C-alpha cells in the first residue's frame, strides 16, 4: 500500500532509458531520468536560465540542458565542473507501474523557493499612462503601432508599468529577466490569452501553440518528435528545389529590369516551403500556381489576424462575406487534411520503415499517433499541421525581408555575406550538402541581428491562471502580462557608447 504522503507523478512504463521525461507535480515542473537502472526525479527547470530540462538529452550519464548545455549527473544532480550547483533530487517510491514523490518534500521545496522571493507590491502601485473612465487606455493603442507605443511608454514609466484595457488589468514588462521568468512559468502559471486560443480553434489552428497545461505537454512531446533533425535533413533537397525556383524568378526579373514585390515573393516562398514540409504538397505559388488548396490556406491567416483585433466577436452572431469564405475554406481544408492523414496512415502500413523516417511533418505526426505512446487524435494532427502553416509563413517571410532590407542598406555587409555564400555555395548558388549549413556563420549572425531589431513577435500576451507574482508585483488571476521582447535590446546601455537601435554585427 502507498502511504498518503506520496504523490503519483508518472507511470514507470513511460520512462525509457536515457530519455528525459517531463513531469508536473501540482504546477511544479519536474524531470524524470532512468539511467543505468536508477530512476531519479529532479526539479524541472535549469538553475541557469530556467530552460525546461525535459527538452534536453542524456549524454554519458549526464542530463544536458537544452539552453546552454549545462550538464547534471543523472544520479546526484550535481553540475559537471561545479558541484556546488546541484539540482534538487526528490525521494521516489515505486509501486507496480507507478512512480511517486514525497508530498511533504515537494511542499518544503516550494517553501524554500518562496522564502527567497521578495515581498510583492500590488499591481496598482505601478506607474502608467492616464486613461479614460471604463475604457482605460484601450483607444490609445493602435494595432499597427501597438508595440511602438508600449515601448515608448516603457521609456517614460520604466520597465514595469500598468495599463487598463476596458475590464482587463495589464502589467507591461520590458525587463528581460522578468520576461524570461514569465516564459519559464508557462504553462502552469501563465497561458496565452484565452480569447486568442478560442479564435485559433475556430479557424482550425488548434495545436500545440494554443494548448495549455497537460494538453500542451502531451502535444509538445509528439510535435517535437515529429520535427526531429532527421526529418529536416530528409526535407533538405525539396527546400533547395523551392529556393532554386525563387532564385530563378528573381534572376529573370533582374535580366528584364523588372522590380519585384519582395515581401510578396518571400511569402510565396515560405508558403511553398511550409506546405511541402507540412504535408508533402508543393503548391508552387512562386510561379503563380494558385490552386484551390493554396487559396483555402490563404483564408486562415487572414481570418486569424482579422478576428484577433476585432473589438467584438461579431462572427458568432452573424457572418460577413469574409467569414463565409473562411467557412468554405475550412470545409475544404478539413476534407483535404483528412485525406492526407488517411494516405499517411496507409503509406506507413505499406512501408513500416516510414515510421522512423517520415517524409513530411504530417506523416511524422501520424507515425507518433500510431505508436500510441501519447493520445493524439486526427483533430490534433490537422490542428498542428495548420499551426505549422501559420507559424511558418508570414513571420518567416517578414524576417527574411528585414534581413534583405538591412543588407541593402549596408553595401559592406552585403559584400561580406556574398563572399561567405560564394565560398560555401560555389557557382551553383545553392547549398548541396546539408552538413555545410553551419559554415554560414556571418549569414546566421546577420539573421539574428535582423530579428533582434525586427522580431516577428515583439509582444507576447499572457494571462495569469491563478494569483501569482511577477517581478515583485502581485498579479491576480485573470490579469494580463504584456511582455516586450524587443525593448531592452534596442535601447542604449549606459556607458557602452553603442547605438543599440542600429544593425551591427
State the predicted function of each range.
Residues 116-205, 209-218, 237-248, 269, ...:
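N-terminal membrane-proximal hinge/A-helix region immediately C-terminal to the signal-anchor transmembrane segment
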Residues 344-358, 418-440, 453-473, 498-501:
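Cytochrome P450 fold signature focused on the C-terminal beta-domain
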Residues 138-158, 335, 339, 430-471:
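Conserved cytochrome P450 K-helix E-x-x-R motif and the immediately C-terminal K′/meander segment
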Residues 164-171, 230-241, 251-276, 284-292, ...:
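Cytochrome P450
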Residues 483-505:
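Conserved cytochrome P450 K-helix/beta-meander segment immediately N-terminal to the heme-binding cysteine loop
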Residues 1-60, 78, 88-115:
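N-terminal pre-ligand scaffold of iron-sulfur
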Residues 133, 139, 228, 329-399, ...:
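Conserved cytochrome P450 catalytic core segment spanning the I/J/K helices
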